[in-house]
């Protein structure tokens, strides 16, 4: 199986456990690894025979911007479900980063990775 990697998808969203996160929002970043059979697209040179990665970016950004989940696990699941829902993918890995997580004395970020198949 082939893979399509889309990295560095950023959007401002309102998912978070604390009220301030859902009110003020924060930046999220997503990396996708999409398992897809690219043989037909490689032969046909037709965008309809693959997953348009611009569409994948738009799906992720829309979910980040419009969702107000408490848990990043829920947001990652929604992203995986939407990518698998295109019908063109067999499996997807979603690496969802909460940039600047609100943790005292912590200046890093937190990344959650999930792997889902249909």
Swiss-Prot record:
EC identifiers of the protein: 4.1.2.25
Gene: folB
This protein's UniProt keywords: Folate biosynthesis, Lyase
SUPFAM superfamilies: Tetrahydrobiopterin biosynthesis enzymes-like (SSF55620)
A GO molecular-function descriptor: dihydroneopterin aldolase activity
Class of the enzyme per the UniProt entry, highest EC level: lyase
Membrane-crossing residue ranges in chain numbering: none
Protein family according to the UniProt entry: Belongs to the DHNA family.
Function: Catalyzes the conversion of 7,8-dihydroneopterin to 6-hydroxymethyl-7,8-dihydropterin.
SMART domains: FolB
Record-linked InterPro entries: Dihydroneopterin_aldolase, FolB_dom, GTP-CH-I_C/QueF
Binding site for substrate: 21, 53, 72-73
One GO BP annotation of this record: folic acid biosynthetic process
Lyase recorded as keyword: yes
Pathway connected to this protein: Cofactor biosynthesis; tetrahydrofolate biosynthesis; 2-amino-4-hydroxy-6-hydroxymethyl-7,8-dihydropteridine diphosphate from 7,8-dihydroneopterin triphosphate: step 3/4
Catalytic site positions: 98
One GO cellular component term noted in the UniProt record for this chain: cytoplasm
Protein name: Probable dihydroneopterin aldolase
Catalytic activity: 7,8-dihydroneopterin = 6-hydroxymethyl-7,8-dihydropterin + glycolaldehyde
């Amino acid at each position: 199986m082939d893979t399509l990697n889309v990295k560095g998808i950023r959007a401002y969203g309102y998912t978070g456990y604390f009220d301030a996160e859902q009110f003020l929002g924060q930046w999220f970043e997503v990396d996708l690894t999409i398992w897809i059979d690219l043989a037909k697209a490689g032969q046909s040179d037709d965008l309809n025979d693959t997953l348009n990665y611009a569409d994948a970016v738009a799906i992720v950004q829309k979910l980040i911007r419009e969702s107000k989940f408490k848990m990043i696990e829920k947001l990652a699941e929604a992203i995986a479900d939407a990518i698998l829902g295109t019908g063109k993918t067999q499996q997807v890995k979603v690496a969802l980063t909460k940039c600047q997580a609100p943790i005292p004395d912590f200046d890093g970020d937190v990344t959650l990775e999930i792997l889902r198949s249909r």
